[in-house]
Amino acid sequence: NGFIGKNGMGKTNVLDAIYYLSFCKGTMSASDAFNLRHNTEFFMIQGEYESDGMGATEVVCSLKRGTRKRVKCDGKDYKRISEHVGKIPLVMLSPADSQLVTGGSEERRRFMDMVISQYDAAYLNAAIRYERTLKQRNALLKAEEEPDRGVMDVLEEMMGADAEVVFNARRNFVEEFSPIFQRLYSRLCPDSREQVTIKYDSHGFRGALQPQLASWRERERLVGYSLHGVHKDELVLELNGYPV
């Protein structure tokens, strides 16, 4: 299927809506608030998916200003929105994908998150918990008063446990994806002698995260944020052994 139309007619908006119904968030807006039209109180996106052997599935995402976002599948509300991710697998291709090569490491982490979260619910839940705990720890690191050691110990223990889940899933993904990437590159550039590789760089290769957080706590208070963890992971792209 294809969408044909003049500029500004909403072709990209249709694609973004389809993406939203799969991931419960858009590709272009950092916040759901930007999806609300000016002087309106709510928005709703509704779609019906059909697949071989599964029949039709109706998905509805809605948000009323000042309230929690709601997601329904075949008329049933999800208790947690993350439960829906992966039910309707989807891959989004756009000109912005060039950022996977030219952009910062957060773009490549986002790519891994998008793929892995669609088939590994434990990964998605661990990643969400990790980001939430990371924000709490960073807030304490920025505080003028010295943070409570007991609270920091608990947060670092939680981060360590979730980081292990995230690290293992990302490492396994890169190991499986790397030969696929190399094979597709060879098909696109059959006459090229260039060797392309993807490598995963993570704190996980240096051991458990919790001891690292504890040992760096005082130094991280000086900068006001966490210097170690899977939020610093990198997907390194190499051409003939050199970073792209």
Regions found by a protein language model. Name each.
Residues 1-6, 19-20, 146-244:
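Conserved NTPase motor "head" modules and their coupling/switch loops across ABC/AAA+ ATPases, GTPases
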Residues 11:
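Conserved lysine of the Walker
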Residues 20-23, 139:
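Regular, well-ordered alpha-helical segments
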Residues 22-107, 113-123, 178-183, 196, ...:
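Nucleotide-state sensing region of NTPase/ATPase domains
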Residues 40-47, 138, 142, 239:
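Alpha-helix boundary/capping detector
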Residues 107-108, 122, 173, 205:
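Short phosphate-engaging motifs
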